[in-house]
Amino acid sequence: MSVTMREMLEAGCHFGHQTRFWNPKMAPFIFGHRNKIHIINLEKTLPMFQDALKYVRQLAANRGTIMFVGTKRQSREILAEEAGRAGMPYVDARWLGGMLTNFKTVKTSIKRLKDMEAAKEAGALDTMSKKEALMFEREMIKLEKSIGGIKEMGGIPDAIFVVDVGYHKIAVTEANKLGIPVIGVVDTNHSPEGIDYVIPGNDDSSKAVALYVRGVADAILEGRANAVQEVVEAARGGDDFVEVQEG
């Protein structure tokens, strides 16, 4: 699925922040301002978004993992939904410091959550006192909320996709430290520095956020489908029937 300029306009991707909050490093992507609000130049945004999606497609075709990060109220639900649709890990609650740089510790929490889920499935709650069962449920809910979206992630991701890079600067810093490429939606009040694939755009409107997140999820599914198609075609190519002329 390719995103059009019209869709971006309708989603309000071009609305930046109030001019007094601007970050001068975003100047190349700003068209002007209206009623003290910066207007983002979508003629810059669209090709940059397409570049990011091309990278996502290639990564997905090579079985890469892309972690979705968006914990603000307006992005949380759609982000979890679309990451789930694409079969990718996501962080939709608070970013825990060290989620990337200290993944070994996070892995311990993931194991704890999975063990608890298995225990519950096996009927462990029936053998507990009311108080123990309540404590168990509380811990499990807390773990599910903080790391449920990354529990199938075996190691650090190949890239992260961040909605609102300023709000998630710890995630961006951790990725930069580990050399993990960052795809990020950058509004007029933040800096594009440290972002490998910048998507200049509104990061506050739920419609705009839905457009970016769906676009990335679609690109992942397309990349995977293309990879499968190539494997099928290669297999077919190897079995071509060739008639040998006798002579």
UniProtKB/Swiss-Prot annotation:
Top-level taxon: Bacteria
CDD domains from the UniProt entry: RPS2
GO BP term (any one): translation
UniProt keyword Ribosomal protein, yes or no: yes
Keywords tagged on the record: Ribonucleoprotein, Ribosomal protein
PANTHER family found in the cross-reference section: 30S RIBOSOMAL PROTEIN S2 PROKARYOTIC AND ORGANELLAR (PTHR12534), SMALL RIBOSOMAL SUBUNIT PROTEIN US2M (PTHR12534:SF0)
UniProt protein name: Small ribosomal subunit protein uS2
